[in-house]
Amino acid sequence: MTLFKRQWFVLVSAVSAALSVVLFPLEVFSASPNSVGGGVQQMNILQAIVLGFVQGMTEFLPISSTAHLKVVPVALGWGDPGVAFTAIIQLGSIAAVLWYFWGDLTRIIKGATRAIALKDYADYDLRLSLGIILGTIPIVFFGLLIKKLIPDFDSSPIRSLGAIAVASIVMSLLLGVGEKLGKRERDFEHLTMQDGLLMGLAQALALIPGVSRSGSTLTSGLFMGLQRETAARFSFLLGIPAITLAGLVELKDVFAEGIADGAALPLIVGVISAAIFSYMAIAGLLSFLKTQSTWVFIWYRLVFGIAILGAISAGILQNS
């Protein structure tokens, strides 16, 4: 099997596996969860593994982990696991990205520290670090603003299946335009602080369920003329502070409200499952984008959104 065919097979298989969970609900998964303190839903180990798989395989692919974590459990009759559970198992994804990019991160931090000591403000690692910091500010600002203005965001209409479907369709079209018009001239060595800020603004759009943090940043990177792999790699690095902060904030809230008996173990299993599959997704996507376009994700998002709207219209899914 050629390298192209192997890469294509891995990516399509991963996405198809995630989709199959939605399309083929099994009796063994049919039990509805009960609410647990902090907005987390009580679940069994098997459910936690499946949701960890969904989180891991969709967090770093440009198809929205939030959308799939909302749709999959609802389609399987489990109910929405909630914002808190989603944010907590993202800690597994952040562990995976830290593991994968540990060498890059240590080099960037050491380089930036050395540049500050030498007052070499033109240093590449320092500028890259500042780009990541600047890019993190928008999502932190708007995230705190939403938490302040919409305290019941977990149950707001913007988290409805219909809204998620529309967001998925819109982002598929935007990614398609970026894929078509992007010049893809600049590699990782030519990133600027301005790139960090602009991709950070795009990252803030991921606060809207269904948009996809990876999808919005990858799309903006293509519009800015970055190579596909460069846009994806920087998107991963940019996401480290945002995903970590979101997970820690929700983790604090969950522990403050208490976790019901039996809920801790599934959470831990979900985090581990998410970490394993996130690592696989990161490696697979970077390898894939070295030689291939994003059209497989564009079409997937479009079909995913249309399928949800169709299921809602047919009464198969409730627009909740």
UniProtKB/Swiss-Prot annotation:
One GO BP annotation is: response to antibiotic
Compartments, record wording: Cell inner membrane
Q: What would be one Gene Ontology cellular-component term for the protein?
A: plasma membrane
Question: Membrane topology per the record?
Answer: Multi-pass membrane protein
Mark the transmembrane ranges.
Answer: 9-29, 82-102, 130-150, 161-181, 191-211, 236-256, 265-285, 296-316
Q: Which HAMAP family match?
A: Undec_diphosphatase
State the protein's purpose: Catalyzes the dephosphorylation of undecaprenyl diphosphate (UPP). Confers resistance to bacitracin.
Protein name per Swiss-Prot or TrEMBL: Undecaprenyl-diphosphatase
The gene from which this protein is expressed is uppP
